[in-house]
Swiss-Prot record:
Single GO MF annotation: magnesium ion binding
Name the record gives this protein: Hydroxyethylthiazole kinase
Family: Belongs to the Thz kinase family.
Source organism (scientific name): Burkholderia pseudomallei (strain 1710b)
Top EC category: transferase
Keyword Magnesium: yes
Length: 276
């Protein structure tokens, strides 16, 4: 299995393209995650719009450079809003990310909406191990929005899900894995305090969308997003507490320079890590 990091040239090239092109990214998420998601996108040079005002789902779902749907948006928006955006994206050929938050945690009606979204063929599906095992048809109930399974236990499930759905699938944990059902890439590193920052996983989905907007291979885009995220978290590791870490993390995202010389701080050298 190949590993990638910030020192992988394609990762730096992907970030450089976002900074150059400032893609317009439309997102549907909940009020808990919206602020961090927008700030992550702004930090890397993308232009975000988040929310379901007026005709945004239909207009921006089709017109944005990429879309991401975090199903926690159902806290404040109806299922029709999410489905409208996904249908518009699919019809227009807009690439989009599905983040099935808390799938399998015990709400059948909610799970049914997620599966309706899956039928609209997202480009990338991003989640934690419990969510993705459940989406693939396995049994792994999470603890609310948090996982009770390891990424390694999800590998067979995410490979099967990728092959059946046609999407690239990425799972987060101490080591992240990204697969198209044929090739699987590993991204280690990050910082465990990302699990203590509300919306950190949701914001990763937003970052994946920003890199997808460049229209390169979806596997490369998604894995690059994971590597960029891990690197910023590592560089924020000397923050004193959780709140200062969250601020420093966004700072470090904004300071990542694709042209910098190689450092001995790549995603893959610090073993602690991260998120739901």
């Amino acid at each position: 299995m190949e590993s990638i990091s910030w020192n992988t040239p394609s990762v730096r090239d992907a970030l450089a393209a976002v900074k150059r092109d400032a893609p317009f990214i439309y997102g549907l998420t909940n009020y808990v995650a919206a602020n961090l998601s927008a700030n992550v996108l702004l930090a890397v040079g993308a232009a975000p719009a988040i929310g379901a005002a007026a005709d945004w789902p239909a207009r921006f779902g089709a017109g944005a450079n990429a879309l991401w749907i975090n199903t926690a948006a159902l806290m404040s928006s109806g299922a029709d809003t999410l489905l409208t955006a996904a249908r518009a994206a699919s019809k227009a050929g807009t690439r989009w990310v599905l983040d099935p938050v808390a799938l399998g945690a015990g709400a059948p009606e909610y799970d049914a909406i997620v599966r309706d979204l899956l039928a609209l063929r997202p480009t990338v599906i991003r989640g934690n191990a419990s969510e993705l095992i459940a989406l693939a048809g396995g049994t792994a109930a999470g603890k609310g929005v948090d996982t009770t399974a390891s990424p390694e236990s999800a590998l067979a499930f995410i490979g099967d899900l990728a092959r059946r759905s046609g999407a690239v699938v990425s799972v987060s944990g101490p080591t992240d894995y990204v697969t198209d059902g044929v090739a699987t890439l590993a991204v280690a590193g990050g910082d465990a305090r990302l699990t203590r920052v509300t919306g950190a996983g949701c914001a990763l989905g937003a970052l994946i969308a920003a890199l997808l907007a460049q229209r390169g291979a979806a596997l490369a885009a998604a894995s690059a997003a994971h590597a960029i995220y891990a690197t910023a978290a590592e560089r924020a590791a000397d923050a004193r507490g959780t709140a200062s870490f969250a601020v420093r993390f966004v700072d470090e995202l904004s300071l990542l320079d694709p042209a910098e010389s190689s450092r001995d701080r790549s995603a893959g050298q610090i073993g602690a890590k991260r998120r739901e």
